[in-house]
Amino acid sequence: MNSYSLAERINSQVNASVTYKTDLAQYGTPEHWCLPYKFGDCEDYALLKRKLLLEQGWPTDKLGLCVCYMPSGEGHCVLWVDTDKGSFILDNNYAFPVKPSELPYKWESMLCDGVWQQLHGFA
């Protein structure tokens, strides 16, 4: 299986298995990053997708947790993946991997290989 197909499968699997629920509703706090069990918000989806891809042997330097802002101004977190078909975003709002340039987000920062970095001109 090529890397794009694996990313597509994991994205679909996680999006279907987790029901969106804010950290405030679930934990009583605005932010709580963890692996989801049935419920989670955007960073929980991204963390689970990252975990499942790593378990399949995906290189850590080809994955990044991205913090961004949606057009509404609300903070959001997605997973960046580098595949055999290029770079894509795995997002709980999309059923399929999306090119960063096709998303309406303002990119803030990315955690890749253990280092947070500012994103300038990412898309």
What is each model feature region?
Residues 1-123:
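A structural boundary/capping signal
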